[in-house]
Design a protein with these regions (language model features):
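Early extracytoplasmic/lumenal segment of secretory-pathway proteins
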Residues: 23-92
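Short beta-strand->loop
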Residues: 99-110, 160, 256-272, 281-284
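Mature extracytoplasmic/periplasmic domains
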Residues: 281-342
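A bilobed periplasmic-binding-protein/Venus flytrap-type ligand-binding module shared by bacterial periplasmic
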Residues: 141-146, 191-192, 274-286, 305
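A ligand-binding cleft/hinge motif common to bilobed small-molecule-binding domains
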Residues: 88-91, 238-259
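Periplasmic-binding protein-like
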Residues: 205-214, 220, 258-279
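Conserved C-terminal helix/tail region of periplasmic/extracytoplasmic solute-binding proteins
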Residues: 229, 337-368
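Extracytoplasmic ligand-binding site segments that recognize negatively charged/polar headgroups
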Residues: 83-85, 89-218, 225-232
């Protein structure tokens, strides 16, 4: 879930303009056009796939799912595979923007985690369109030393770290960020208030708005991407992040030889569990190649390498034993059964409710 473009496995991540230009110029059909977050793939996955199949991958990146939705709904996206959060998919399925998976071309489908498959039924019954990729939770990443220096008795493990003005104000000077994602932050605010985190009722949204406005003076930035740099650099000490990102941020601190110790917790009050999947657009020019790539990802050794690089739990049960022990045993990435009981799935909101949520978020970000 990254913004900066970079080279992965010798393959260039290109801009949308370059993608459109390439599509206009045509290709031999020996191509796969993939739309994904930056750094949300194994370090050598694309190169390994090209070596194994001879199919060249054009990897285009985005920094928000809203962009993906817009491209799909306008048609002629030019992509063969796109990454999406499962909660966003039901209205897109209804709009007919995807083509169904041909399971005959996916003989390794049985490798998928049965619990993940079960969790996804509410978004896409029978997983007619969804190819499971990764899953995770939302939580709090913090700089251990900076938090301890400012508040030795800080309520580590609680959403009060972010949502109690008397507490979060203690950390404002060392940098506090929230995701720029209303469907992540507002449910957590509601959960902290003891309300239904999936609610979009006007009274509940108003309560969440008031809570968030109360801590707004202490939030340095709304950011879903750059904390991967600001946390390991020491520019931010407390951030709402996705689960795997804390491990990536810590690894970057180690690589930069910075004496920064980061930690992560899934709030005791509960948090979101999310699922990212791959989808084939209705107008995909190389649907057969898309199926070949999905089948490649269904190989345990392939997905284990992906998790080892991006630090997110994958949806391939057969790959778990091949994941590095330090990642596989990290409770932030692979939470135990008791912790998973505290996690709740995201709700697919109606367009009307999403407009209300967006209005609340705009008010919170501007501070009035």
């Amino acid at each position: 879930m990254r913004k900066a473009l970079k080279v992965i496995g010798g393959l260039l991540l290109v801009s949308s303009t370059a993608l459109v230009q390439a599509a206009a110029e045509g290709d031999s059909g020996n191509t796969l056009r993939l739309y994904n977050w930056t750094d949300y793939i194994g370090e050598t996955t694309l190169a390994d796939f090209e070596k194994a199949t001879g199919i060249k991958v054009v990897y285009d990146t985005f920094d928000g799912y809203e962009t993906v939705q817009t491209k799909l709904l306008t048609g002629r996206s030019g992509y063969d595979l796109v990454m999406l959060n499962a909660s966003l998919v039901p209205p897109l399925i209804q709009a007919g923007v995807f083509q169904a998976l041909d399971k005959q071309q996916l003989p390794s489908w049985h490798n998928l985690d049965e619990q993940v498959v079960s969790n996804l039924q509410g978004y896409d019954p029978g997983l007619k369109y969804s190819a499971p990729y990764t899953w995770g939770s939302s939580g709090v990443t913090y700089n251990v030393d900076k938090i301890k220096a400012r508040m030795p008795d800080a309520p580590i493990g609680s959403l009060a770290m972010l949502f109690d003005p008397a507490i979060v104000s203690r950390f404002a000077d060392c940098g506090v960020t929230l995701m720029d994602a209303p469907t992540e932050v507002i449910p957590l605010a509601l959960q902290y208030l003891g309300k239904d985190p999936r609610s979009a009722a006007p009274a509940d949204l108003k309560a969440a708005e008031q809570l968030l406005l109360g801590i707004r003076p202490y939030i340095r930035k709304f950011d879903s991407v750059n904390y991967l740099t600001s946390l390991p650099n020491g520019d931010v000490c407390l951030a709402l992040t996705w689960s795997g990102d804390y491990a990536t941020a810590q690894a970057r601190a180690v690589e930069a030889k910075k004496a920064i110790k980061l930690a992560f917790f899934i709030p005791k009050e509960g948090s979101l569990i999310w699922f990212d999947n791959l989808y084939i657009p209705k107008d995909a020019p190389h649907a057969s190649n898309a199926h070949r790539f999905i089948e490649f990802l269904l190989q345990p050794q392939t997905m284990a390498k992906v998790t080892n690089f991006i630090h997110y739990a994958n949806s391939n049960a057969a790959a778990t034993a091949l994941v590095q022990a330090d990642i596989r045993q990290d409770p932030a990435i692979y939470p135990d059964a008791q912790t998973r009981e505290r996690l709740f799935a995201q709700k697919t909101q109606t367009p009307k409710d999403m407009r209300a949520i967006t209005r609340v978020w705009s008010t919170v970000k501007t501070g009035f």
